[in-house]
Design a protein with these regions (language model features):
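Hydrophobic membrane-targeting alpha-helices
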Residues: 21, 25, 29, 165, ...
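N-terminal signal-anchor/signal peptide hydrophobic helix marking the start
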Residues: 6-12
């Protein structure tokens, strides 16, 4: 197991380089010039037609100096090489938007996004697995059909629409005020509050964003669990266990569920990047100061250093998620022995 984990960690290096290389060139090919945005803000927006020749020359000179300062006037492969060299020392440079160190901005916001994603993944599995077990043990009943219909409806609801409707109807819009419309803390939040009150306030703010980030995940995952269990329930060893007189509860929980979890562990690697992508929408709509909101603002500002830093963090988290899901397979199914050859 240890040797396999080491091999996978080493293979993550070329994978990471390939992912960041593609992301780097796609980002630079996107429309919009950060130098023009910078010059427009610094010179009063005088970048359009109808300004004086002197003003136009001042704008062009400012943009040329700014591009040279950040190396944007160099070939793309040279820019990527410089970026990769700085990445080794975690030197992501300064943000184009506010000249703040990119790494400090990420470190400040990373715990919020990790908390949201961790709670969302936990909620997805806590809801999806019991729903899948119930549907598989009650196939083709009205409750199974209702759960299937409910899951497909949830899976089809766009996250942007669901979050907007939640704010309008239950977050102090025109109807109810059950949850706060944004942020992580109340306006009267104080560090002098007792621990339980701080936890209660944060849970109140996190509940709705976590649920919204999770609903399509547990809707789809519950269907995977149902299909996997139905397949396992038809195996010969399940019939043998029943023939030995074992109760249905023991058969399901001891023999069926564990083998049914193998596909769900594999799917974990695909859920993680999807939830990270969903955090961009949720953090932006609910004004949560996480990496998703930072990424959205950086894209609008063409903040290349911040975008690439966030892209790198997301790539690393995704690769780690894939590795963890592979290692968990050996825990769920002891027959799997990674790195061994017969």
């Amino acid at each position: 197991m240890a040797s396999y984990a080491l091999q996978r960690l080493l293979l993550m290096i070329p994978t990471f380089i390939g992912v960041t290389l593609i992301g780097f060139f796609i980002m630079r090919l996107a429309p919009g010039d950060p130098a023009e945005l910078r010059a427009a803000g610094g010179l009063g927006g005088a970048t359009g037609a109808g300004i004086s020749v002197e003003k136009r020359m001042a704008v062009d000179e400012a943009m040329a100096q700014w591009r040279a300062q950040y190396g944007l006037d160099r070939p793309l492969h040279v820019q990527y090489g410089i970026w990769m060299k700085n990445l080794v020392t975690l030197e992501f440079g300064e943000s184009f938007k506010d000249n703040q160190p990119v790494w400090s901005k990420i470190v400040e916001r990373l715990p919020v996004t990790i908390k949201l994603n961790a709670l969302s993944i936990l909620l997805v599995y806590l809801i999806a697995i019991p729903l899948g077990i119930y549907s598989a043990t009650h196939p083709d009943t009205w409750s199974d059909q209702a759960l299937t219909l409910f899951a497909f409806v949830l899976f089809a609801v766009p996250l942007v629409w669901a979050a907007t409707m939640a704010i309008v109807f239950i977050c102090g819009g025109d109807f109810l005020y059950l949850f706060p419309p944004g942020g992580l803390e109340s306006l009267d939040y104080s560090q002098r509050w007792p621990f339980w009150r701080k936890m209660k306030d944060q849970a109140w703010h996190l509940f709705l964003p976590v649920v919204l980030m999770s609903y399509d995940g547990f809707a789809g995952l519950s269907r995977y669990m149902r299909a996997s269990m139905l397949e396992v329930l038809g195996q010969d060893y399940v019939r043998v266990a029943r023939a030995k007189g074992l109760t249905e509860k023991v058969v399901v929980l001891k023999h069926v569920v564990r083998n049914s979890l193998i596909p769900l562990v594999t799917i974990l690697a695909g859920i993680l990047p999807g939830i990270i992508g969903g955090s961009v929408i949720i953090e932006t709509i609910f004004s949560i100061p996480g990496l998703g909101q930072l990424g959205y603002e950086s894209v609008l500002a063409r903040d290349y250093p911040t975008i690439m830093a966030l892209f790198s963090v997301s790539a690393v988290l995704t690769l780690i998620g894939i590795l963890i899901s592979d290692l968990l397979l050996s825990v769920v199914d002891p027959r799997i022995a990674f790195g061994r050859r017969e």
